[in-house]
């Protein structure tokens, strides 16, 4: 049983009742998670972006996909739980080289959205100890949302 109460909602651009795994690889597939703990909300929106080989101009798809999630941390429960505005007209890809680690995602500006590259379960990062992100990773790995829907 998860220590978080996770409610799965879908963005209006995606149809409900479709498991996430069928959307991985489709550009700008958005999913929103609202988790409740201690009367605070974490708002998380997932976005899958096709990976390219990194060459300028003639970027070719590599067959892999970057998976991002946008975190709007700790929205007070008393406020309306509308989605934060986060439109990715141009998908953002990480500027870090492979193996360079993830930098620059710990900025704490109030009310700002943090774009965090998805980390695979093989990456033993300190972020793995943050239980919310671990559960998000676990849900993605399972690819089945029905049993998490409350």
UniProtKB/Swiss-Prot annotation:
Q: Where is this region: Disordered?
A: 81-125
Biased amino acid composition, Polar residues: 81-90
Q: What is this protein called?
A: Uncharacterized protein UL107
Its taxonomic placement starts with: Viruses, Duplodnaviria, Heunggongvirae, Peploviricota, Herviviricetes
